């Protein structure tokens, strides 16, 4: 009979292998879960500003900086990109989404300066046919009767470096006829306000409602009923300089197609009564009207062809432009009794177009229309 040698240790190890493997796996899983829970706990304690997917949007940590403060780096650049307008149609309406340039924001020697310091308070009333805010949209809105903003946001993009002092502010007022803030105390009381240093970017979202309003194609409507409100900006405690640019982004619905409203401005002043009559868009305003001088102010950036006719007892005139404007080409005819001046001009920021050296100037009328510099005024 042959002897057989048996080793029960192998059978015992085989029986223990499965439980040991399961226990080891559970231990690894438990350890991973503990590590993951620890990472989540640390992540939850981090400030929200440091939780970006990458470091591009994270705030810079600085000693002694208050939470929410924005640190000033040595230099900072903002990319301003063009955007294609989007059009949608539905149930007799047209929806437009676009971004436009509004104006440069200027400061003056530490003063409290609102809307660059010139013009009526309601220049920037929110209505699609206002060329001060929507210079591109007016060409489309002139073909409709009603509008409704679905979204509206203004953005300030700086032009200055991080050593520039002062502050800039964007504000919104629901009443388009309110006079606007005259000091910092009044500015601080606005419910819709965004203030920041002039070297940083800021945005102001305007609250919109679901109300259809009429487009302002005449001067006889009640501004409180036809406008969504008014927008404005302020610079204070800073230098005399162009601090930054203002842009507007919007989505607006236009309703009820109509014959095109006048896009040519006609501004007539009758000297005996000093009454001014305007038809069309408000590109220019008559600031000075005397027997020797006529001065119009332009505040909407762009290029125009301007025609001015007036009465005078003696021929002769001297044209000039001051501020942020350039006369590209011009032509004039002046005789005793009546005179005419035609010019192609470009307005970059508030500018005054003047006719001086007049004698006995009386009734005056200005016509203005958007153009390009190639629409040169010349006599061949």
Curated annotation (Swiss-Prot):
Superkingdom of the source species: Viruses
Record keywords, A-Z: Capsid protein, RNA-binding, T=3 icosahedral capsid protein, Virion
Keyword Transmembrane helix included in the entry's annotation: no
Major place of residence: virion
Annotated stretches, region: R domain, interaction with RNA: 1-92
UniProt-annotated stretches for the region Involved in encapsidation: 48-53
Region (P domain, projecting): 255-380
Pfam families: Viral_coat
Alphabetized Gene3D superfamilies for the sequence: 2.60.120.20, 2.60.40.4030
GO cellular component, one term: T=3 icosahedral viral capsid
UniProt-annotated stretches for the region S domain, virion shell: 93-254
Coiled coil segments of this chain: none
Annotated compartments: Virion
GO molecular function: RNA binding; structural molecule activity
Entry-linked InterPro entries: Capsid_prot_S-dom_vir (IPR000937), Viral_coat (IPR029053)
Protein family (similarity comment): Belongs to the icosahedral plant coat protein family.
Subunit-structure text: Homomultimer.
Function: Capsid protein self-assembles to form an icosahedral capsid with a T=3 symmetry, about 32-35 nm in diameter, and consisting of 180 capsid proteins.
Record protein name field: Capsid protein
Originating species: Cucumber necrosis virus (CNV)
């Amino acid at each position: 009979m042959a002897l057989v040698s048996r080793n029960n240790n192998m059978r015992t190890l085989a029986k223990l292998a499965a439980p040991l493997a399961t226990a080891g796996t559970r231990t690894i899983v438990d350890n991973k879960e503990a590590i993951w829970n620890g990472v989540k706990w640390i992540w939850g304690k981090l400030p929200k500003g440091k939780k970006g997917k990458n470091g591009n949007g994270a705030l810079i940590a600085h000693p002694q900086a208050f939470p929410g403060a924005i640190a000033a780096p040595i230099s900072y650049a903002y990319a301003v990109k063009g955007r294609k307008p989007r059009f949608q149609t539905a149930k007799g309406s047209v929806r437009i989404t676009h971004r436009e340039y509004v104006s440069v924001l200027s400061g003056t020697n530490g003063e409290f300066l609102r809307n660059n310091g010139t013009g009526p308070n309601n220049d920037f009333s929110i209505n699609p046919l206002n060329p001060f805010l929507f210079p591109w949209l007016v060409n489309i809105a002139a073909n409709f009767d009603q509008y409704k903003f679905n979204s509206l946001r203004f953005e300030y993009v700086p032009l200055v470096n991080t050593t520039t002092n002062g502050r800039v502010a964007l504000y919104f007022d629901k009443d388009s006829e309110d006079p606007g803030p005259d000091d910092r105390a009044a500015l601080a009381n606005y419910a819709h306000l965004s203030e920041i240093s002039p070297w940083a970017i800021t945005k102001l979202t305007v609250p919109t409602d679901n109300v259809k309003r009429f487009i302002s194609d005449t001067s006889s409507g009640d501004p409180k009923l036809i406008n969504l409100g008014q927008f404005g900006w302020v610079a204070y405690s800073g230098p005399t300089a162009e601090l930054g640019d203002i842009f507007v982004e919007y989505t607006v619905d236009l309703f009820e197609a109509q014959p095109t409203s006048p896009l040519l401005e006609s501004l007539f002043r009758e000297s005996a009564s000093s009454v001014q009559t305007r038809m069309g868009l408000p590109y220019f305003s008559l600031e000075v009207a005397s027997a020797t001088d006529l001065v119009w102010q332009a505040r909407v950036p762009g290029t125009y062809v301007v025609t001015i006719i007036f009465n005078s007892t003696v021929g002769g005139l001297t044209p000039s432009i001051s501020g942020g404007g350039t006369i590209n080409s011009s032509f004039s005819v002046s005789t005793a009794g009546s005179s005419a001046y035609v010019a192609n001009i470009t307005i970059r920021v508030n500018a005054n177009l003047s006719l001086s050296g007049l004698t006995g100037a009386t009734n005056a009328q200005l016509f203005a229309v958007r153009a390009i510099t190639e629409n040169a005024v010349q006599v061949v």
